[in-house]
Amino acid sequence: MMAENNLKMLKIQQCVVANKLPRNRPYVCNICFKHFETPSKLARHYLIHTGQKPFECDVCHKTFRQLVHLERHQLTHSLPFKCSICQRHFKNLKTFVKHQQLHNETYQNNVKQVRRLLEAKQEKSMYGVYNTFTTEERWALHPCSKSDPMYSMKRRKNIHACTICGKMFPSQSKLDRHVLIHTGQRPFKCVLCTKSFRQSTHLKIHQLTHSEERPFQCCFCQKGFKIQSKLLKHKQIHTRNKAFRALLLKKRRTESRPLPNKLNANQGGFENGEIGESEENNPLDVHSIYIVPFQCPKCEKCFESEQILNEHSCFAARSGKIPSRFKRSYNYKTIVKKILAKLKRARSKKLDNFQSEKKVFKKSFLRNCDLISGEQSSEQTQRTFVGSLGKHGTYKTIGNRKKKTLTLPFSWQNMGKNLKGILTTENILSIDNSVNKKDLSICGSSGEEFFNNCEVLQCGFSVPRENIRTRHKICPCDKCEKVFPSISKLKRHYLIHTGQRPFGCNICGKSFRQSAHLKRHEQTHNEKSPYASLCQVEFGNFNNLSNHSGNNVNYNASQQCQAPGVQKYEVSESDQMSGVKAESQDFIPGSTGQPCLPNVLLESEQSNPFCSYSEHQEKNDVFLYRCSVCAKSFRSPSKLERHYLIHAGQKPFECSVCGKTFRQAPHWKRHQLTHFKERPQGKVVALDSVM
């Protein structure tokens, strides 16, 4: 007997060591054959098979099988744990403590003190919910150890798998909610807009969009939000602002209160909940510490961080600093070179603006044999040259045959003109030297002076006044926002918006907005077209006549050239330039009726790079074929015949696919390409097959 008792005690001790006691489960379910220790547990288990849920919630009418589940559910309606910083409610202590750790990194030191207060609140709110057990009863109810498979099953996570996608979930309710994605069901429907959602929380968030109420208000700037999460993100902006934190601490010192701990900018929260409560409850403090975070003082725009504010263009221009990203990306020497190169390009554009004046000016030099020929003696008298710019008067050429220089007007020297072989570089600035010294002086010797000068940076990205001869457009249109350089052009532009055409033709009644357009139109009614007296050619308008007469030179020879000798001839141009008189000793005998040009002049025109035969030939093309209807002139009879189709309204070329007609064959062929299509094998339909 003693041996048997010892064996029993040994077994009990082994069970105690293994955290296990022998169980006796005599009560078996006749449906699923599960075993239970007590009849109460068996009766509770029968509710699963019958589907009964006798415990109902008075608030939301949700039913449960056990009373403990109902009491735990009722905590969701009361939420006894409230955060003093963000005013958020929690139903249990564990989630509330985790939430407090997010607000403050050093909150773990005060966890014990907070737990005592919260446990006292929890005991009051949870009174009568949980039954207290003794140590022996807890041991009897929970005898299983970690090695027991039932224990590992309870501790296992994500044990509910979806049969469609195989995704795991920790509970059946979350699995059921996930199945709604596959079935496409959205049981929660909005009454106002009939929009449906899978979860009730999503529906509640959506219903806030229909109301103009903003229940969540910031205690610092009084800004309202519909969702609490957006309010929390907004408060982090205040806590990241250094000026806001400094002002908050200063406010605390003046009120002779204990100085709060340093605010954590990384976590974006406060050290304790008392600060948030005082700021929210005291309205005077709210208005005194109202600061818009990271706001530009010029344009009043707000930014998320101080770095973005420093890179803001208005803020950088006001403070005289260059953005940090601009300094990192480029070296200041390269920036200086780029800006100066931009100024040089702006200066060099002047040469392109006066190409027509250069050609006229060049012709007058080529006619002057004094400047081209280097074989003539230096004892000849000085000859006068009438320049192309009549407003500057008459300019003399100095008879120095070694330098071959010519004194020009002041405006031509400022433009950087340097005619090869005629002018020296002493009197005229080159393109490299055309940049003003003022632009170079303001840059500064060091990189800091250069980057801190906003005028230099602005001139690098906008063309200054001194470097380009452009008229400033100061008269804007209030309808289309176009800008014009003078009020007269603005008034002329207003006629487009009003639709007025004040200049009417007396013959056909057609009206125009400008008098120049009316004069050009009246040429079509005249019997005689503009007439060139030299070559006896008629033109359709005065523009063609002026271009023709400006490019031709009238040679009036006093007598025919029979043999080489010393003779005089006059060269006169028909445009605004005054006449040029020159003398020469060498003539080339030409045929009768043709002007005689000096040998040196012909050689210079052939060898001069400025002379272009193609340009001269294109400008002197004669329009000999004139339309009898609109008096328009053409170079060839084929173009005139094609033009007559416009007056006749004929379109002889017809598309065989869509029946569209065209006036010209190229237009018809180009239209045929629109009907091209690629076959499935990748072969393209041929043009002949389409035609």
UniProtKB/Swiss-Prot annotation:
Keywords: DNA-binding, Isopeptide bond, Metal-binding, Nucleus, Repeat, Transcription, Transcription regulation, Ubl conjugation, Zinc, Zinc-finger. Residues 258-277 are annotated as: Disordered. It comes from Homo sapiens (Human). Belongs to the krueppel C2H2-type zinc-finger protein family. It comes from the Eukaryota. It is found in: Nucleus. There is a cross-link at K11, K112, K121, K146, K262, K420, K437, K683 (Glycyl lysine isopeptide (Lys-Gly) (interchain with G-Cter in SUMO2)). The keyword Membrane does not apply. GO terms for biological process: regulation of transcription by RNA polymerase II. Coiled coil: none annotated. SMART domains: ZnF_C2H2 (SM00355). The keyword Amino-acid biosynthesis does not apply. May be involved in transcriptional regulation. This is Zinc finger protein 770. GO terms for cellular component: nucleus. GO terms for molecular function: DNA binding; zinc ion binding. Disulfide bonds: none annotated. PROSITE patterns: ZINC_FINGER_C2H2_1 (PS00028), ZINC_FINGER_C2H2_2 (PS50157). InterPro entries: Znf_C2H2_sf, Znf_C2H2_type. A zinc finger (C2H2-type) spans 27-49, 55-77, 81-103, 160-182, 188-210, 216-238, 294-318, 475-497, 503-525, 625-647, 653-675.
